[in-house]
From Swiss-Prot:
GO molecular function: alkylbase DNA N-glycosylase activity; DNA binding
Protein name, entry field: Putative 3-methyladenine DNA glycosylase
Family: Belongs to the DNA glycosylase MPG family.
Enzyme nomenclature, EC number: 3.2.2.-
Keywords linked to the UniProt accession: DNA damage, DNA repair, Hydrolase
Domain of life (superkingdom): Bacteria
Keyword DNA repair: yes
Xref: PANTHER family: DNA-3-METHYLADENINE GLYCOSYLASE (PTHR10429:SF0)
Record-level GO BP terms: base-excision repair
Keyword set includes DNA repair: yes
Length: 205
């Protein structure tokens, strides 16, 4: 399965394109990835990105972003919601793709049990925190190999699909980069919200 991971030995935007349409399976739930965001790395690396957790270098928190590709990088947003990323690029070079939304195909009842009985199906895995909640992804999954069939969370790549791109959600730096990609027409895709701390549109990296 590491042959599949080699498909992610590319820049983060290309990796994001390749992850759209992939099947993500976790703890009784599976779905198609419909929205992602690419993140680069350190200032002197090939893809400097001030919005990335890895921008200031290797830390205990972000080491998974430095490879190898195909590993799950988890973190808590605002100290509450678990978010999931897939490492990409050459081993030792920081880059990852944030999984923002998925269209669930199997285990919808399991996901609804985790998210709430009244949550609309299209919203079960809409947004990074909701995706992890629906899939049962936790901080304990940090660093697992997504292409290992014995992992609690696995990934299966397919042929890339046509994507739409635009600015990333909620970042205050590098806020104009069109590094958010999604599948058009999917109701599971989240709404775009620009960070109130970001410069005016057109004035940021």
């Amino acid at each position: 399965m590491r042959d599949a991971a080699e498909q992610l030995l590319v820049d983060p935007v290309e990796a994001a394109r390749r992850l759209l349409g992939a099947t993500l399976t976790g703890r009784g739930v599976s779905g198609v990835i419909v929205e992602v965001e690419a993140y680069g790395g350190v200032p002197d690396g090939p893809w400097p990105d001030a919005a990335a957790h890895s921008y200031k270098g290797l830390r205990a928190r972000n080491f998974v972003m430095f490879g190898p590709p195909g590993r799950l990088y988890t973190y808590r947003s605002h100290g509450i919601h678990v978010c999931a990323n897939v490492s990409c690029g050459p081993d030792g070079t920081a880059a990852a793709v944030l999984l923002r939304a998925a269209a669930l195909e199997d285990g919808t009842d399991v996901a609804r049990g985790r998210r709430g009985e009244l949550v609309h199906t299209a919203a079960l895995a809409r947004g990074p925190g909701n995706l992890c909640a629906a899939m049962g992804i936790t901080m304990a999954d940090n660093g697992i190999d997504l292409f290992d069939p014995d992992s609690p969370v696995t990934l299966r790549l397919h042929e890339p699909l046509t994507a739409v791109c635009g600015p990333r959600v909620g970042v205050s730096q590098a806020a104009d980069r069109p590094w958010r990609l999604w599948l058009p027409g999917r109701p599971e895709v989240s709404a775009y919200r620009r960070s109130p701390r970001a410069p005016a549109p057109g004035t940021s990296d």
